[in-house]
């Protein structure tokens, strides 16, 4: 059996605040700018510019290009973009930790012969570092991040990419996530079984008529269920 996991809100408990003054003041200092709020407006304008170029709503642009544009606007080498992106993320982040049982669950699934994959709507310039920080990068058989492949869940194309990249069959895959729209709706429609866990980061979709194959109340139950399915 192959288990495909969402990251944020499913395996990792995260909270960020991209509006707080400390973020924009810190970024302004890094760029030798005086007006932190003007810098925020510039960032949002560049994001909006890239967003408007998308062919459809589930196309995922790479946020690193925004940081490259901000640097280029100031005559600074684009090579500094990953460093600026890391600073942005660290300053915006208020919490990042694994949910209970996650490391043990991933390790036991792999030990039992299951395939363990990460399929996340995320920005690679943030997420690759955070996977290392959480010490779980090496626990997956494969990783697909939406900004790297240009499309996000629930669009079927991201599941096409995952199955082709890792030579998987959807009948042998179970998708695990905390979002009824991005995770359950997409994987259900694709023909995979789904496991849903509600966490603080779960979206609210009162009008969405979607039912997961399984629902668990906590990560201890998730671990038991997935091991029983393998």
What are these model-derived regions, one by one?
Residues 1-3, 13-14, 29-37, 79-81, ...:
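Asp-based, Mg2+/Mn2+-dependent phosphohydrolase catalytic module
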Residues 1-100:
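N-terminal helical cap/lid subdomain that shapes the substrate entry/recognition surface
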């Amino acid at each position: 059996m192959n288990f495909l996991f969402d990251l944020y809100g499913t395996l990792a408990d995260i909270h960020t605040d991209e509006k707080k003054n400390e973020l924009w003041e810190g970024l302004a200092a890094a760029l030798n700018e005086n007006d932190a709020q003007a810098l925020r407006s510039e960032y949002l304008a560049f994001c909006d510019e890239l967003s408007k170029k998308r062919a459809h709503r589930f196309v995922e642009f790479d946020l690193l290009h925004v940081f490259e544009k901000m640097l280029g606007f100031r005559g600074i080498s684009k090579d500094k973009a990953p460093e600026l992106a890391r600073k942005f993320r660290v300053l915006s982040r208020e919490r990042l930790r694994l949910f209970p049982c996650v490391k043990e669950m991933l390790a036991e699934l792999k030990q039992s012969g299951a395939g363990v994959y990460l399929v996340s709507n995320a920005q690679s310039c943030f997420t690759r570092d955070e996977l290392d920080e959480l010490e779980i990068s090496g626990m997956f058989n494969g990783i697909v991040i939406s900004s790297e492949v240009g499309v996000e869940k629930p669009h079927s194309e991201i599941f096409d990419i995952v199955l082709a990249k890792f030579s998987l069959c959807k009948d042998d895959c179970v998708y695990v996530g905390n979002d009824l729209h991005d995770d359950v709706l997409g994987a259900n429609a694709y023909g995979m079984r789904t496991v849903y866990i509600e966490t603080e980061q779960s979206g609210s979709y009162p009008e969405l008529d979607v039912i997961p194959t399984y629902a668990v109340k906590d990560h201890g139950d998730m671990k038991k269920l997935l091991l029983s399915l393998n």
